Amino acid sequence: MAQALDNSPSYPSGEAVDFAVVGSGSAGGIMAKELSMAGFSVVILEQGPHLQAADFTHDEWSIKHNFELEWDWRKGHPQTFRRTENETAVVGDSSLRYAHNVGGSSVHYSGNFWRLREIDFIEASVRGPIAGTNFVDWPITYAELEPYYTKVDWEIGLSGLQGPWDPPRSRDYPCPPMPVKSPGVLLERAAKKLGYTPYPAPVAILSQPHNGRPGCIHCGFCNGYGCEVNAKSSTAVTMLPLALASGNCELRTECTVSRINTNAVGRVTEVVYWEADGTEVAQRANAVVLCANGAETPRLLLMSATGSFPDGLANSSGMVGKNLMFNGYTQVIGLFDEPIHAYKSVPVTRVVHDFWTLDESLGFYGGGGIDSRHPYGGNLIAAGLGGGLFGGPSWGSDYKRSLRQLFTHSCSFDGHTTSLPLASNNVTLDPNVQDMWGRPAIRVTY
């Protein structure tokens, strides 16, 4: 982490900066760093607080029940969900789980850091069209993107080892892979026995000191938690310190953006937001970069509709918010006679990517990877909220005994798969539900 002095300016909201960046996560943090270090004036608008390493604790109840690092849909930030457009969306947990703090979800995610393969960029050309989908090639190739993958690897800090199915890379990982933990050993043994090729998982967690940050202390509180020693390579501890030290970047926290305004010729002029006390501010900017994740970005574009842009900004195609794609997820949990203690250390240390591209003769599309981990992210509270052993007791001493067994003797094997782009899977504005600021709630149809 850059330990330079925070030399950030304070820009008047009524004077246009070169760039207003909405969001400080994986995209926003990098964008702010690149722009500010190139000499541009930048204001970052972040909806959450600026938490430091000392703020990150092992409080399982706060994290897993109260969603301390996320927007809690139960407390002023509702989301609605429906499976088809013929249904009425209902308020609930829609699976849009993202952090609200400086660094965004790069602060609380598991650290898995897989590269796409060459085929992923040209798959439509190779496989042909898929009826009923908007399946197309990327406008760039893996070869064009590879230098930037490597730049990210080294600047934020990754640990790993080139695997047998990995695409070409111009430089090795900056840090060696994490030591293998018990779920990784189980996956490795089973995969090799079946003829597959497991290898060390690439993770955005430091196995050794890098760029002034320490290596992992293997506390086990990664998935859903911020890192108490800054070994997890979030943009909050990698990119943003450099941006703020440039003298060209101002970070404003707890700013809830409501809309993006344009002038008579359709050019963006300002971002309107509320401060924590409800004061409305309009920050003028020559350009606006939306880095508010795959849900909040379309929400802001749709909320910025005007007479000139009746369907929202940048939506002449009608595609804003459509073709929503999730990480397909299948989990098998094994309960072992002997203790596994899978909750220790980082979530994942071994992966199997033999199934990244499947045999088309199987009759369906897509592939993915497999990893092994603790089924409840190493959190006893999460295991308890999950009900303990399947079909087992749910109260009393027998329940506590079964919960201890589940927590210490279980291991999950998790499949991460592709999903197809369908216009019917989308993020739109709910016409009937609003958040605490009066903004239309995010409505997920999937």
Task: Enumerate the predicted regions with their spans.
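Short, solvent-exposed loop/turn and secondary-structure capping segments
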Residues: 53-57, 105, 110-112, 120-121, ...
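Conserved N-terminal glycine-rich FAD pyrophosphate-binding loop of Rossmann-like flavoproteins
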Residues: 49-72, 99-112
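Glycine-rich loop(s) and the adjacent beta-strand/alpha-helix scaffold that form part
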Residues: 37, 41, 48-62, 246, ...
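Extreme N-terminal leader/targeting segments of oxidoreductases
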Residues: 1-19, 37-38, 62-64
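N-terminal Rossmann-like FAD-binding beta1-loop-alpha1 element of flavoenzymes
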Residues: 19-44
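Short, hydrophobic/aromatic-rich segments at coil-to-beta transitions
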Residues: 266-272, 410
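Conserved redox-cofactor binding core of oxidoreductases
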Residues: 68, 73, 80, 84-92, ...
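FAD cofactor-binding and catalytic pocket of flavoenzymes
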Residues: 84-98, 102-105, 109, 115, ...
